[in-house]
């Protein structure tokens, strides 16, 4: 099963945290890397005003696995916590790393704590740009057009600047 992951970081050594997350994801048995996007520096989106001046680094990983979505979610939460993310009552507060599942093949899941595809992915340039780099012709369930087409029509004016192609 092909899974698209969005990785983000906006605390301290952001690139180091993205690299650690990638390494820990790929160290899990049964996970293979199919593609990775460049890393972009991006403006914060949907964060409280006091965090508006803290830019993110964002990227996308495409993995192949037979591991269940629920097990993957547990793995990713463990990795986030291991890298230093702590629960906070403040929504979208700064974090060392955030790992979100954008899509999982053609699956559509809507449960208490899991919605796949991610409901806000097509609205966020910090997800759509790196996803378009690695899967431009992909049509994710719930969308009638490709990722690259969504990018050309995106209304999100936030800044997305290439930081590095290799990481």
Per-region residue spans from a language model:
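Short basic (Lys/Arg) and small-residue
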Residues: 61
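N-terminal beta1-alpha1 ligand-phosphate binding loop
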Residues: 1-31, 36-44
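Flexible, gly/pro- and Lys/Arg-enriched active-site loops
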Residues: 45-56, 67-73, 78-167
């Amino acid at each position: 099963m092909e899974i698209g992951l969005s990785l983000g970081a906006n605390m301290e050594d952001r690139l180091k945290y993205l690299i650690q997350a990638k390494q820990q994801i790929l160290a899990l048995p049964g996970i293979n890397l199919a593609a990775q996007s460049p890393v972009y520096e991006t403006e914060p989106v949907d964060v409280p005003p006091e965090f508006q001046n803290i830019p993110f680094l964002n990227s996308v990983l495409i993995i192949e696995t037979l591991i269940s979505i629920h097990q993957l979610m547990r793995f990713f939460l463990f990795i986030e916590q291991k890298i230093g993310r702590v629960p906070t009552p403040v929504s979208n507060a700064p974090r060392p790393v955030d790992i979100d599942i954008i899509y999982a093949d053609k699956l559509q899941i809507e449960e208490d704590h899991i919605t796949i595809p991610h409901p806000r992915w097509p609205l966020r340039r910090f997800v759509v740009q790196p996803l378009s780099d690695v899967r431009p012709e992909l049509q994710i369930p719930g969308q009638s057009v490709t990722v690259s087409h969504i990018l050309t029509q995106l209304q999100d004016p936030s800044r997305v600047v290439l930081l590095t192609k290799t990481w």
